[in-house]
Amino acid sequence: MPSQVSLLTDPFLQAPTESSVKVVWFTEFKGTDHRVVYGPAQQTVAATTVQLSRTREDAQSKTTQSYDQVTKRPIWRHEAEISGLRPGLRVPYFVVSTPPTGNPIGSDQFTLGPTPPAGQPLKILLTSDHQLMPMTAANLQKVQETIGQVDSVFLAGDLVNIPDRASEWFDDTRGGAFFPCLQGRGSYTLEKNGTRTRYKGGQLIQSAPLFPAVGNHEVMGRNSATAGLNDQFNDPVPWAAAKTLYDQHKNVFNPTNAPDVEQRWLKNQSFNIDTYNEIFSLPKAPRNDGETQRYYATTFGDVRLVSLYVTQIWRMFTVDDKTRGRYQERVADLDNPKNWGHGNLIFESIEPGSPQYAWLSNELASDEFQQAKYKVVMLHHPPHTLGGNVVPAFTNPVPVYDHDDDGNLVGIRYEYPKEEDHIINYLMPLLENAGTQLVFYGHSHIWNRFESESGMQFLESSNVGNSYGAHTADNPRPVPADRRYKEVYEATGDPNGLTPIMPTLETLNDDAGNPIPYIASNDITAFSILDTGAGMVSSYYFDTGQPESQVVKFDEFTLGQP
């Protein structure tokens, strides 16, 4: 605990209902008497305190304290639900925590309210892929300076890089951690053209509820007492592979045959989103085995938001026998299945027959969705994009085993049949038939948008902190050129058949001076705002290479009624 005791974060808002909202904050001490003080009469509500179970640091952490190995970092979460609130009425609040010193610590004062009533005009930030990237603090600062206090934040995944590394959420010394940037307490310095500019992010979520979706960077891989956090993050395997190993050595791993031991072992030896689940309080979706917040739906004013868990591990696109990638295993690992990566494995199914698909089908048919003025579906993986992460198809990897003439295994390759793409073949028809107006996503670190024949809008507004480029004719994606691969992997354009829409207000140009229908820049950062009063989605950019320049609104489109 630092010598100057303080709250680890400002409070932020979660899971509003028609008469309540949850207030959450974090400390590095367990403390006592954690409470929310709210309203003109300064009513108080005591908070429930729990310790995060998996937050750690390691030698790669950017912290004031150095770590030689993976080390557990104690973080406490405090949550209080404020009830009896009136629709449309906001009240002031602050939080108080008492550390072991006995001297209470209070936050600044902010405002809270329940979910807005239908008809109330709202401005909602659409953002994704923060990941402590260089321009994120600048982006969020410009959101606050341009829009003012937003009413909510919809965040389409990839909040941090390594979800179990505590400092990435709270206090990375580079100044771009997740909560500081969304609370106006960041301190990230960009150097552009010889000019250094420090950005603090925007004071946004203290007074506006945050609704995230799970991206691939919210998922930790196999747990280890010795491997670094980066290596653990990059090492998920399917539950089926973990179960096979468990069954082979069940008497060793679980000699008493306890069900909780089995489930814990399988989670630790496959993948998990425990830290994400422990940090956030989100609406719950019913399942046969209980409830989940991995995916959910909620009504916020005139918006029905559906947040899906549609993502997969990101593996290297390099095609060679020395890389455990999306297209093959390392030759050196062929005799050791425990080291196999299993290609671009999908973390949660959206196929027909899966729990998520069944829940979504019911949700899309519900009165809450069908009667909503604006129907918005948020997920991490892109259905349509010029970015790199849309190839190969979003489907279960099909292993191909190569043998020599003597029958020896000499290679494992993975194919991804395009006709089995789960998003395009199963999810998109479901959304289209239900009258969805906006599909919002991220993952490729690019701004571009598309429109289907029926008028469903697709927006990827993920050129927030950085970009990895748009794959046009002069910048093709790395895809397999080996003739052994039978599938076709598109190197340019949107592989799923839509043409990107040129921005309606102002376009950027390529090096030849031609207008381009995207932003893929490490100097220009973009954000989008859903204005429910106008029925409009507007997108803005800011050139960090010209820190004195103005924010530019460059695109807008309306959300038509289906």
What is each model feature region?
Residues 4-8, 15-22, 28-31, 42-44, ...:
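N-terminal active-site segment of His-dependent metallophosphoesterases
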Residues 120, 135-140, 156, 174-181, ...:
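Stable alpha-helical elements in mature extracytoplasmic
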Residues 123, 151-152, 207-212, 373-374, ...:
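Proline-centered loop/turn at the N-terminus of a beta-strand
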Residues 137-140, 161-180, 219-232, 388-391, ...:
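Metal-dependent catalytic neighborhoods of phosphoester/phosphodiester hydrolases
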Residues 184-206:
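Short mixed-charge
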